[in-house]
């Protein structure tokens, strides 16, 4: 796959690189004893290229594609690190990539007191449990990054039980059992009230309290609409107060409905249809 005509993902700087390299490496190491040459080639290509995708975490752990795609891309990145360490005994420095050690704080920072995400870029505002947060909390001894995570996990499991397993569960959810460690009952919150991410798609997040459910929270976004999953929403913001989201981001719009109208989302030329659609 590294040399086919569909190899654009190999040097991708977005979540494609994390997802594809993470999945291929997990598969390659699973057959290491039978296909050592293929496994070696796959790992080599991954280590040479996945750092391009991981560069987006710099400098403070934010993610330009928003919280929803953070969970998607970062889950495969954590899995990649996990399989490398499990099989080969090292992650070859991937976990030391600039900003990666801080990215476990990002979902908590990007979530308002309403328990909704600041859903800039192409994602929804709903918060679901993210198993990789247990990995980050254990790895970097920051159990305050798990704010509300156990409660969200309990609610999801209760919903699943009530629906007899019909819920749309995260495929990585079972890994939470491997990554959970016993931490302080209620760890002291070391997260800031005011934070800005830096980077090419900067965001700023401000809140009046971490413990008051009626606290005021505002999130601002800057950057360029040409960013991966970027929308024509530069300068957008969300506002929470008294447990209610008063100012919202419209969130994602399905690709099919747009493309069925004959509009081309993937052309980045000056006069492309892409720049005439607010949410894509």
Where are the regions that the model predicts?
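Catalytic and substrate-binding regions of extracellular carbohydrate-active enzymes
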Residues: 156-280
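Well-ordered alpha-helical scaffold segments within catalytic/enzyme domains
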Residues: 20-36, 74-91, 134-140, 144, ...
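C-terminal, helix-dominated tail/subdomain
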Residues: 91-171
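Generic structural hydrophobic/aromatic packing signal, biased to beta-strands
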Residues: 24, 46, 53, 107, ...
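Aromatic-lined, polymer-binding surfaces characteristic
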Residues: 1-116, 123-124
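Extended glycan-interaction surfaces of carbohydrate-active proteins
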Residues: 1-7, 30-56, 132-168, 198-203, ...
